[in-house]
Amino acid sequence: MLVMNLQLFAHKKGVGSSKNGRDSEAKRLGVKCSDGQFVLAGNILVRQRGTKIHPGLNVGRGGDDTLFAKIDGVVKYERLGRDKKKASVYPVEVEKVVAE
Protein backbone atom coordinates (compact mmCIF):
# COMPACT_ATOMS: atom_id res chain seq x y z
CA MET A 1 0.00 0.00 0.00
CA LEU A 2 1.34 3.36 -1.06
CA VAL A 3 0.99 6.19 1.48
CA MET A 4 1.64 9.74 0.22
CA ASN A 5 2.53 12.48 2.62
CA LEU A 6 1.55 15.76 0.90
CA GLN A 7 2.89 18.97 2.40
CA LEU A 8 2.19 22.39 0.92
CA PHE A 9 4.93 25.01 1.14
CA ALA A 10 4.67 28.72 0.65
CA HIS A 11 5.39 29.77 -2.91
CA LYS A 12 5.93 33.45 -1.96
CA LYS A 13 8.47 34.76 0.49
CA GLY A 14 6.95 36.14 3.67
CA VAL A 15 7.59 39.91 3.79
CA GLY A 16 7.83 41.74 7.10
CA SER A 17 6.31 45.16 7.64
CA SER A 18 8.46 48.20 8.38
CA LYS A 19 7.58 50.75 11.04
CA ASN A 20 9.53 53.48 9.23
CA GLY A 21 8.74 55.30 6.01
CA ARG A 22 6.95 58.48 7.12
CA ASP A 23 8.01 61.97 8.09
CA SER A 24 6.35 65.21 9.13
CA GLU A 25 5.99 68.13 6.74
CA ALA A 26 8.57 70.92 7.03
CA LYS A 27 7.26 73.94 8.98
CA ARG A 28 9.12 76.64 6.99
CA LEU A 29 10.58 78.33 10.06
CA GLY A 30 13.27 80.99 10.03
CA VAL A 31 14.00 84.62 9.22
CA LYS A 32 11.69 86.01 6.51
CA CYS A 33 13.02 89.61 6.33
CA SER A 34 16.73 90.33 6.51
CA ASP A 35 18.59 93.10 8.36
CA GLY A 36 18.23 96.51 6.68
CA GLN A 37 15.22 95.45 4.61
CA PHE A 38 12.20 97.79 4.32
CA VAL A 39 9.00 96.20 5.65
CA LEU A 40 5.35 97.17 5.82
CA ALA A 41 3.22 96.96 8.96
CA GLY A 42 2.03 93.37 9.42
CA ASN A 43 4.92 91.77 7.53
CA ILE A 44 6.29 88.63 9.17
CA LEU A 45 9.92 89.03 10.22
CA VAL A 46 10.67 85.64 11.84
CA ARG A 47 8.79 82.35 12.15
CA GLN A 48 10.08 80.44 15.16
CA ARG A 49 9.31 77.96 17.93
CA GLY A 50 9.99 79.65 21.25
CA THR A 51 11.71 83.03 21.49
CA LYS A 52 15.06 82.48 19.77
CA ILE A 53 14.73 86.13 18.73
CA HIS A 54 12.86 88.50 21.06
CA PRO A 55 10.56 91.32 19.90
CA GLY A 56 12.11 94.79 20.08
CA LEU A 57 10.88 98.26 19.16
CA ASN A 58 7.76 98.29 16.93
CA VAL A 59 7.69 94.48 16.70
CA GLY A 60 4.86 92.25 17.94
CA ARG A 61 4.84 88.58 18.90
CA GLY A 62 2.08 86.24 17.74
CA GLY A 63 0.62 83.27 19.59
CA ASP A 64 3.08 80.88 17.90
CA ASP A 65 6.04 83.22 18.71
CA THR A 66 6.06 84.67 15.18
CA LEU A 67 7.55 88.19 15.07
CA PHE A 68 5.82 90.80 12.91
CA ALA A 69 6.27 94.50 12.13
CA LYS A 70 3.86 96.95 13.79
CA ILE A 71 4.87 99.91 11.59
CA ASP A 72 6.41 100.55 8.18
CA GLY A 73 10.19 100.85 8.45
CA VAL A 74 13.57 99.15 8.30
CA VAL A 75 14.35 95.90 10.13
CA LYS A 76 17.32 95.83 12.50
CA TYR A 77 18.52 92.69 14.31
CA GLU A 78 20.44 93.47 17.51
CA ARG A 79 22.14 91.55 20.31
CA LEU A 80 20.80 91.60 23.87
CA GLY A 81 23.80 90.72 25.98
CA ARG A 82 25.86 87.68 25.13
CA ASP A 83 23.33 85.12 23.96
CA LYS A 84 20.03 86.88 23.19
CA LYS A 85 18.87 88.63 20.03
CA LYS A 86 16.05 91.05 19.31
CA ALA A 87 14.37 92.33 16.17
CA SER A 88 13.29 95.98 15.89
CA VAL A 89 11.67 98.07 13.17
CA TYR A 90 12.73 101.70 12.91
CA PRO A 91 10.66 104.24 10.94
CA VAL A 92 12.21 105.77 7.84
CA GLU A 93 11.82 109.42 6.94
CA VAL A 94 10.60 109.63 3.37
CA GLU A 95 11.69 112.66 1.37
CA LYS A 96 8.99 114.14 -0.81
CA VAL A 97 10.06 114.71 -4.38
CA VAL A 98 8.44 117.80 -5.85
CA ALA A 99 8.08 117.87 -9.62
CA GLU A 100 9.30 121.19 -11.00
Curated annotation (Swiss-Prot):
Gene3D superfamilies: 2.40.50.100. PROSITE patterns: RIBOSOMAL_L27 (PS00831). The keyword Ribonucleoprotein applies. Residues 1-9 form a propeptide. The N-terminus is cleaved by ribosomal processing cysteine protease Prp. One of its GO terms (biological process) is translation. PANTHER family: LARGE RIBOSOMAL SUBUNIT PROTEIN BL27M (PTHR15893:SF0), RIBOSOMAL PROTEIN L27 (PTHR15893). NCBIfam families: L27 (TIGR00062). This is Large ribosomal subunit protein bL27. The lineage of its organism: Bacteria, Bacillati, Bacillota, Clostridia, Eubacteriales.
